[in-house]
């Protein structure tokens, strides 16, 4: 039984010109202990999917789905109070730019202690304060912060971006989640710090069997850490496959374009040579093309592309394209 099962998730925004689809019929199934990657350009709907899973929706949103089940519990049939309790006990989310998520006027130790849920405590009520402090120290050690005294006394601006992100991960782990959503957790960080954060998340997955949903725009990075990757373009899933298969045998032109856009530092490039990019720009949500949304930019587009392609293929490798690539190699 999957931990999270989503079928045909659609998210719409209400604007002055009517309803606009930001996410269109996205499906996803996450198993217990899996690391799933969600990759796409800015505006492809990655963060919206994460917020829909957590139940964080604004008043001008309309979220619909054929199925949205967490541990075989239908999230769509729960009241807001019941869903908040279920998500609060089982799901945590790590946001990008950790320093903007922490209170700059409060010491890190106090913020961490305040975010430890009371329901995780099993002892006497008068021992709760001492337990919170010990639990906060344990969480800091767990995420790789050895000098807990200095970290707990510090304000967020006194820590580096990597240390702040480790504190955010410690806060996310305080409720012992079964699903951890990391929304670009290493954005604008140095490569060494990025590797530390991803090694930490992988270790948490291996030791605690925590399911992790990694959201990023960096396909090369996701392919190193995720078991399976979903590729999004303009709010639609264009390809889903295990990481190794996706990188070595992409079937969708957009996935191929993402792979070709990764710079190759192993070979010299001619002077003033162009990088591999798709022509044109991402269409506006109010002016989406007919049929395949990549059609106007796709080098392989043909007349049939005015018909919207459906996700097809084998069970482990799905693609939404009328003229898939690399089919002769299978």
UniProtKB/Swiss-Prot annotation:
Keyword Ribonucleoprotein in record: no
Keywords for this protein: ATP-binding, Cell inner membrane, Cell membrane, Membrane, Nucleotide-binding, Peptide transport, Protein transport, Transport
Similarity comment text for this entry: Belongs to the ABC transporter superfamily.
Residues annotated for ATP binding in this entry: 40-47
Name under which the protein is recorded: Peptide transport system ATP-binding protein SapD
CDD domains (alphabetical): ABC_NikE_OppD_transporters
PANTHER family found in the cross-reference section: OLIGOPEPTIDE TRANSPORT ATP-BINDING PROTEIN APPD, PUTRESCINE EXPORT SYSTEM ATP-BINDING PROTEIN SAPD
Disruption phenotype: Loss of resistance to protamine.
InterPro entries recorded: AAA+_ATPase, ABC_Ni/Peptide_Import, ABC_transporter-like_ATP-bd, Oligopep_ABC_C, P-loop_NTPase
Pfam families in UniProt: ABC_tran, oligo_HPY
Biological processes per GO annotation: peptide transport; protein transport
Naturally occurring in which organism (per UniProt): Salmonella typhimurium (strain LT2 / SGSC1412 / ATCC 700720)
Topological category with respect to the lipid bilayer: Peripheral membrane protein
Role: Involved in a peptide intake transport system that plays a role in the resistance to antimicrobial peptides.
Induction or repression: Part of the sapA-sapB-sapC-sapD-sapF operon, RNA detected in mid-log phase cells.
Presence of keyword Nucleotide-binding: yes
Residues in ABC transporter domain copies: 6-259
Protein location: Cell inner membrane
GO MF annotation terms: ATP binding; ATP hydrolysis activity
Gene Ontology CC terms, in alphabetical order: plasma membrane
